[in-house]
Amino acid sequence: DDCGKLFSGCDTNADCCEGYVCRLWCKLDW
């Protein structure tokens, strides 16, 4: 659930990606 991890790989933290502003970072990571 740590959004911080999603910076290195949002694929492993899809839940966080869909959960909060981290979603934006997830898309940027693509």
Swiss-Prot record:
GO terms for cellular component: extracellular region. The keyword Transmembrane helix does not apply. Disulfide bonds join C3-C17, C10-C22, C16-C26. It is found in: Secreted. GO terms for molecular function: calcium channel regulator activity; ion channel inhibitor activity; potassium channel regulator activity; toxin activity. Keywords: Amidation, Calcium channel impairing toxin, Disulfide bond, Ion channel impairing toxin, Knottin, Neurotoxin, Potassium channel impairing toxin, Secreted, Toxin, Voltage-gated potassium channel impairing toxin. Expressed by the venom gland. The modification Tryptophan amide is found at W30. Negative results: has no affinity for Kv1.4/KCNA4, Kv2.1/KCNB1, and Kv3.4/KCNC4. The presence of a 'disulfide through disulfide knot' structurally defines this protein as a knottin. Belongs to the neurotoxin 10 (Hwtx-1) family. 19 (HpTX2) subfamily. Inhibitor of voltage-gated potassium channels of the Kv4/KCND family. Inhibition of Kv4.3/KCND3 and Kv4.2/KCND2 is strongly voltage-dependent, while inhibition of Kv4.1/KCND1 shows less voltage-dependence. Its binding site may be near the potassium channel voltage sensor. Also blocks calcium channels. This is Kappa-sparatoxin-Hv1b.
